[in-house]
Amino acid sequence: MDPERSYVYVSNINGDPDEKNGQGYLSRLTTDGRLTEQQWVTGLNAPKGMAIHDGYLYVADIDRLVKIELNTGRWVRDFTAPEALLLNDVVANGNGTLYVSDMVGNALYRLQGGEFVAWIRDDRLMHPNGLTIHDGALIVAAWGTPINADFSTAQPGSLLRIDLTTYTITEIDGGESLGNLDGLVRVDSGYVVSDWMSGTLMRIGDEGRRTVLAHWTMGLADIGGAGSTLVVPFTMDGEIRAVSVAP
């Protein structure tokens, strides 16, 4: 979501999640839900998570991070990671460093100073998916492990905190074994996460309290938003909803 320009950007895989078919694209909607450009940026493979920094949109696209100029939709450049298996979400911190999750590869990548490389590989990541940054740490919504052929897991994913100075990985209180986590945002004094497999939207408060906000069907994916209004995609239904999570 781009409050500055009053747009919502939507990634459309248009194929299998790991298929390099060049048919993926980005759509642009107004913040009141009106579709302005269905194929705003084309030629992608299977685009997923996105982040905005300094007038540019960065898009995770299987094994590359694509940089798009927001004012024009111009494709500026790619940052490639040939060893990545399924780049998923993207987040930017205040100094311009970007972090990208590789869910299938069980790794986190970092773009810093024009260099895009694997930053952390650790089994404790539990197949990282959604990302956000808060209070000097990278917060990770993990999918769980091991990943079966149908993407179910024996062990549910947790909400993790990675200190950006020490790289220490810990579980967040109340965020242990939540589910097959996908979307993640910081809202007020807690985190809102989505469970893709169960279709559950949950809030994990800083005090460690879990609250189920809504329960829908399978396919609840990445989350965007501003304030207490979230934009929630339903990937199996081809639908986007605005959801209020005001306390």
Where are these regions (language model features)?
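Beta-rich, blade/repeat-based domains predominating
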Residues: M1-R5, G22-Q23, V41-Y58, P82-Y99, ...
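Beta-propeller domains
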Residues: V10-R34
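Recurrent small/Gly-Pro-centered beta-turn motifs in extracellular repeat architectures
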Residues: S11-I13, D61, D102, A142-G144, ...
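Short glycine/acidic-enriched loop and turn motifs that connect beta-strands
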Residues: N14-D18, R64, G105-N106, T145-A149, ...
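WD40 beta-propeller blade core
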Residues: S27, V66-K67, A107-Y109, L160, ...
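Short loop/turn segments that connect beta-strands within beta-propeller blades
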Residues: L29-R34, E69-R74, L111-E115, D163-Y167, ...
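A short beta-strand motif characteristic of beta-propeller blades
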Residues: R34-V41, R74-T80, E115-R121, Y167-G174, ...
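Asp-box/WD-like beta-propeller blade repeats and closely related beta-sheet repeat scaffolds
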Residues: R64-T97, S101-A107
